[in-house]
Amino acid sequence: SLGFKIMPLYIKDMSRDKIIAASTDGMMMSGRSPFIMQGWADMEKQEIEDIEKVLKSKGIKSELEVDIGLVPEIVTDRMKSCDILLIGKNEAITERIVSILKGNYKSIIFIGEKPLKRMEKVIIANDDGVKINRSCYQFTNLFPEVKEFTSFVINKEIEENHLIGYLEGKEKTITHEVLNTTDYNEVLKKIDEYDFFIMGNLSRSYFFEKIIGKNGIKLLEKSKTPIFIG
């Protein structure tokens, strides 16, 4: 109903094959690896069957493609033919997701607890930086039908917000506010009232930002609302 043509893709991750036990003298102990590999093969088969059932139940007629290789490399190659990468999101940024974020050159939508059903209420994390500006540029080109946005910044007055002016120049209606709070549960609660959340891409030092508790990591990991990063 949102007008997407979906290309479902399942990747059998070759990096799993690198997991193998080693003895104390450095000799490789591969005796148990066939059992491990068979267990993974059975799990992958079941996952593929489960995904195919879900696709069918959702009315998605596109055939699930199965590829084998390193996940970031395959994603990078497949995105040459696509506009947006759609990824399921847990409450943690894994190393695999970080690799995809670093290498991806197209827009990304993260889907967490809350499904993407409509785009009537869209909210922007607006610090007037270049990354959120780029995300909004990509979003408005991909979804020109969205005309109204809510914009917020946390504990920061911006005298001249260029992003607001940019969006208004594209005939968009913007409602902007400053959230004066140090409680990120309040911010998340507000975001989760919306259908879609636009944020800028994070810096390349994802895990360092996670350790020191940077705002973007918190919002990316904890938000239930679907997230768009351009």
Label for each model-derived stretch:
Residues D13-R16, D25, P34-Q38, D42-L85, ...:
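Structural beta-alpha unit
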Residues D77-V146, K222-G230:
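Intrinsically disordered or low-complexity boundary/linker segments at protein termini
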Residues P72-E73, T94, I132-N133, E160, ...:
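Short, well-ordered alpha-helical microsegments
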Residues E49-K58, T94-E95, I158-L167:
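Short, charged N-terminal beta->alpha structural module
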Residues S1-G31, G103, R118-L179, K190, ...:
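Small/aliphatic-rich secondary-structure junction motif
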Residues V66, L70, E91-A92, K114, ...:
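Short beta->alpha linker loops
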Residues E44, I48, I97, S135-C136, ...:
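Short, highly selective alpha-helical patches that border small-molecule cofactor pockets
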